[in-house]
Amino acid sequence: VTSITLDLVNPTAGQYSSFVDKIRNNVKDPNLKYGGTDIAVIGPPSKEKFLRINFQSSRGTVSLGLKRDNLYVVAYLAMDNTNVNRAYYFRSEITSAELTALFPEATTANQKALEYTEDYQSIEKNAQITQGDKSRKELGLGIDLLLTSMEAVNKKARVVKNEARFLLIAIQMTAEAARFRYIQNLVIKNFPNKFNSENKVIQFEVNWKKISTAIYGDAKNGVFNKDYDFGFGKVRQVKDLQMGLLMYLGKPK
């Protein structure tokens, strides 16, 4: 299993950027190009199913497991308050045997299936966000926030609310930043500070499949055949979307 590590002890914007690029480069197929663009495209499913992301702080490491064929989150690994490694996983996304290969530090006895599902709505419900529209948007983004949310699950007894908040922030700072340079650039622009998220970020996240499909099936030389609106105004030039990574949709048309 490939591991990609982000050092949160003294991170720089450059380190974060190259961390996101590494995720993108690990899952892309260099030979795939959609819509006459040079945007990276995820490769077809392969034998290596998962990617391991490590967040390192001065207090230890918390790891995230992502599916290589779509960057969906499958599991995370953290030490509890007695310094025992525990792996928590989404049952529909990964088996116990696969989890052992991904996070060998946790014994089978210390694997636990999460009581909720891997979609944003389910994680948000467990994050108990009370302000605004009660979605992940209210939590914000940023390196400092990633560190504080990680420390809330690092060497602590499990608290579902803290776990869900960590997952919401970590998914966006890894998978979503790899998919959308727009999000990666916001993190860098505000580095390392926490910043308020915005509707455009959420619109990107919920439209990844739609955007990928439009570029795959309805763009030539980087231009859409018609105007598209993905929730933040009309777009005709693919480059205006600042995409980082497209969903695998088969051989180019």
UniProtKB/Swiss-Prot annotation:
State the top-level EC class.
hydrolase
Q: What are the recorded GO MF terms, alphabetically?
A: rRNA N-glycosylase activity; toxin activity
Top-level lineage group: Eukaryota
What is this enzyme's catalytic activity, as reactions? Endohydrolysis of the N-glycosidic bond at one specific adenosine on the 28S rRNA
Q: Does the keyword Hydrolase apply?
A: yes
Q: Which GO terms describe its biological process?
A: defense response; negative regulation of translation
Active-site residues, record numbering mapped to chain = 176
EC nos = 3.2.2.22
* Hydrolase found in the keyword field: yes
**Keywords for this entry?**
Hydrolase, Plant defense, Protein synthesis inhibitor, Toxin
The family line of this record is: Belongs to the ribosome-inactivating protein family. Type 1 RIP subfamily.
User: What PANTHER family is this protein classified in?
Assistant: PTHR33453, RIBOSOME-INACTIVATING PROTEIN (PTHR33453:SF34)
Described by its record, this protein's role is as follows: Ribosome-inactivating protein of type 1, inhibits protein synthesis in animal cells.
Identification of the protein by name? Ribosome-inactivating protein saporin-7
